[in-house]
Design a protein with these regions (language model features):
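Terminal substrate-recognition subdomain of acyl/acetyltransferases
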Residues: 32-46, 94-140
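Short amphipathic alpha-helix that is part of the acyltransferase structural core
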Residues: 1-25, 130-140
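Generic preference for well-ordered secondary structure
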Residues: 1, 17, 38-43, 77, ...
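A conserved beta-strand-loop-helix scaffold within acyl/acetyltransferase catalytic domains
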Residues: 19-60
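Short linear motifs at secondary-structure transitions and domain/linker junctions
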Residues: 4-10, 19-20, 27-35, 67-72, ...
Length: 140
């Protein structure tokens, strides 16, 4: 069963970032994904005056996972971070992980590429109206 949980301590966050080969961001909040008790992925995110920022969304590198576990872990964890950002009253979010592939996953999570190349989503009513996702309604 897939679980997405906040990482409770900075040492745990740092260790999971090392397992995912991503930089540890001491000032970022973080979630971890697990499937059947096995940690699969980590997400680091933050908020500032500009909006929410998903800095990293990555699988741990020390174990192989099925495509299903990989896709579900990344998609649901990305959406969980977006929902937390939205619940904090921050209604703009940016996907900042420039090394993340494939772009299709970023789009399926809900982000759209702006003219400047940044990935953006307007979270206003995003979780109220799920049918709007992916239809060009998320503009900066």
């Amino acid at each position: 069963m897939l679980e997405i949980l906040p990482i409770q301590t900075k040492p745990e966050q740092e260790a999971l970032c090392a397992r995912a080969s991503i930089p540890y961001r001491v000032d970022a909040m973080a979630y971890r994904a697990s499937v059947d008790g096995e940690i699969t992925a980590v997400c680091q995110f933050s908020m500032d005056a500009e909006g929410g920022h998903i800095h990293d969304l990555a699988m741990v590198k020390d174990k192989e996972f099925s495509d299903r576990d990989r896709i579900e872990s990344l998609f649901v964890m990305g959406r969980a971070a977006m929902n937390f950002i939205d619940l904090c009253g921050v209604h703009k979010a940016y996907f900042e992980d420039t090394a993340f592939e494939p772009e299709g996953m970023i789009k399926s999570i809900g982000f759209e590429k702006l003219e400047d190349g940044r990935w953006f989503v307007d979270l206003t009513d995003f979780f109220v109206e799920p049918c709007q996702h992916g239809h060009g309604l998320n503009k900066a």
